[in-house]
Amino acid sequence: MPFLPITVKEMREYGWEQPDFVIVTGDAYVDHPSFGTAIISRVLEHAGYKVCIVPQPKSDNDYKRFGKPRLAFLVNSGNIDSMVAHYTAAKKRRSDDAYTPGGKSGSRPDRAVIVYTKKLKYLYPEIPVCIGGLEASLRRFAHYDYWDDRVRPSVLIESGADLLMYGMGEKHIVEIADRLAAGEDISSLTDILGTCYAVNAADYIPISGAQECAAYELVSVPDEKGKRLYAKA
């Protein structure tokens, strides 16, 4: 089984002119099931979709390597949270990176999901961006960030992504792909289990039986009340 394309030359060898999806990841491309990018890309390939991969982009040209995907960009930080990959518990910069060629550090940015998504939204504002992986999953709600020592908003809000997938993404990525391919707008994908999406407050409709957490503006206040609300949420 050949590797999936990470260069235009390799895409041409597949006979493709345009990919359906471009995966942007903070790790090197390793086609092994211990890597989320490998699993998601092969699941999509098995479902009949053309997938190209941009590992550890640095310049605008890296993001633009394959041009606009037909359906969406898919973004993850890699196998682990980018801040955990970069810093020790003592907040010291790590000197190596197990998920980068040669073990060298510095090939992905801090808070990679936010950085990658904002760049893609700047370059291709009309193309949907779906985020997933461990960093997106564990930061999908307002969360305490050890390195900033404060509560940060959901990574979905900070990044500006259209859709967040959490947990085992292979369980819902094909449904997302099929519905986008059928012509549905990304904003209409509001009924897929294992996903999060943002709505304007004016458009919010309470869901019967759902637990509603306190707003970020309340849980992020560093006083006793805010901390209690955060713990409850």
Specify the residue positions occupied by each region the protein language model found.
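Long, low-complexity, serine/threonine- and charged-residue-rich intrinsically disordered N-terminal tails
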Residues: K9-R12, I23-D27
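Glycine-rich beta-alpha loop elements in corrinoid/cobalamin-binding modules
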Residues: G36, P55-A233
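Loop/helix-junction capping segments adjacent to catalytic residues or to phosphate/diphosphate-binding pockets
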Residues: V30-D31, V174
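Active-site-adjacent bridging/hinge elements
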Residues: G15-Q18, V151
